[in-house]
C-alpha cells in the first residue's frame, strides 16, 4: 500500500465511522449498544491494518498512523484545556473526527461525574492509537515467527 493510499484510507475510514457513530455526541440520545458495536468494529479495523502492516514490517505505516492519532490526541487535549474560551468551536471541529468514531464507548461511561467526562474525551483518540500499535507489533512478531519457521523447514 502506497503512502498516499494509506493516508486516504485512514482519513476516509475515520470520517465514515465518525458519521455513523455521531449519535449522542453533539445532540440527541446518548450512545447505545449499536454505537458501542461500531466503535469496537472501528478498533478491529485499525488493529487489522496495524497487524497487516506489521507483518509486512512497513514502518512508514506506523509513522503515519502514530502521527494521525497523535494529532487527534493533541487536538482533544487542547479542547479540554481551552474549553472555556470562545475558540472552542474551531477546536472541537478539529478534534471531532478523532472523537466521534469512539463515541460508542460513551455507552459504558454514561454515568461519569463531570470531572471524569474530560477523561472520557481524551481516551477516545488514545484507544485507536494503542490498538494500531498493538496490531502492528503483533503482526511484526508473527512475521518474525514465520521467518524462524522457514529457517527450520527442510
How would you describe each model-predicted region?
Residues 8-13, 61-79:
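Transmembrane alpha-helical segments of multi-pass membrane proteins
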Residues 39-64:
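Canonical alpha-helical transmembrane segments
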Residues 31-43, 65-66, 75, 91-99, ...:
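Alpha-helical transmembrane segments of polytopic membrane proteins
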Residues 45-49, 121-145:
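Transmembrane alpha-helical segments in integral membrane proteins
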Residues 104-130:
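Hydrophobic alpha-helical transmembrane segments
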Residues 81-104:
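Juxtamembrane non-transmembrane "cap" segments at the membrane-aqueous interface
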Residues 18-29, 52-53, 76-86, 108-110:
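Juxtamembrane "helix-exit" motif on the non-cytosolic side of transmembrane helices
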Residues 1-45:
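Transmembrane alpha-helical insertion/packing segments
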